[in-house]
Curated annotation (Swiss-Prot):
GO cellular component, as recorded: chloroplast envelope; chloroplast membrane; chloroplast thylakoid membrane; plastid thylakoid membrane
Free-text disruption phenotype from the record: Reduced chloroplast biogenesis and chlorophyll synthesis associated with less POR protein accumulation.
Topology in membrane: Multi-pass membrane protein
Residue ranges crossing the lipid bilayer per the database entry: 156-176, 201-221, 231-251
InterPro entries to which the protein is assigned, alphabetical: CPP1-like (IPR021788)
Name the record gives this protein: Protein CHAPERONE-LIKE PROTEIN OF POR1, chloroplastic
Gene Ontology molecular function: any one: protein folding chaperone
Protein location: Plastid, Chloroplast envelope; Plastid, Chloroplast thylakoid membrane
Amino acid sequence: MATTLISKLTLSSAFLGQQFSSRGNSMRSAPAGLFLRGPRCAATDTPYGGNIPQFPRVNVWDPYKRLGISRDASEEEVWSSRNFLLNQYYNHERSAESIEAAFEKILMASFINRKKTKINLKTRLKKKVEESPPWVQNLLSFVELPPPVIILRRLFLFGFMACWSVMNSTEAGPAFQVAISFGACVYFLNDKTKSLGRAALIGFGALVAGWFCGSLLVPMIPPNLLHPTWSLELLTSLFIYVSLFLGCTFLK
């Protein structure tokens, strides 16, 4: 009886061992992909990488409201708002494009307004000239505005003459420099008016006007503001250079 029970227990344990071993082999032979496979990442199912911040005012039509600024904002405030928003949403392509588009619209509107302001200013000045008295119109007909290059060249010439006179103030008077400046003034006016007599008359008038203003204003300057070697003649010549420059540059 005991022998029979021992044999049954031996057979059952052997059978159970075979079952466990077969299950272990089946688990080892199972494809590795079943164990490597896990839940998909949610970031791959969402556009633009999932957690990238998006600009909340992408669809706002007004460019000022889109950038979060007022219509009276300065150019520095516009640039600052644009840079701040781009630093926050540069990873989101649509947000960055929306911010840049609003910024470009504001710049274009500012350029158009400036252009209109310049045109309106010219129109107003022209209208005021037309509405002015006849003697004012006749006076303005003798005035013109040359290109900036011509203004700078003549300013350099007469500025050089003034510096030359100041540097030689201890040796001799500025008569030679004034004569050269007067000749240059007549030359420029003759090239403009094509009339030597008219050019000489305007140049002489500019010379007299500069001398008169210098003789009248120089004595009013406090002596402690002037260099000891600067004479009345030298200071008067500086006014003459200014008058000759204005005459040959803006008169016709």
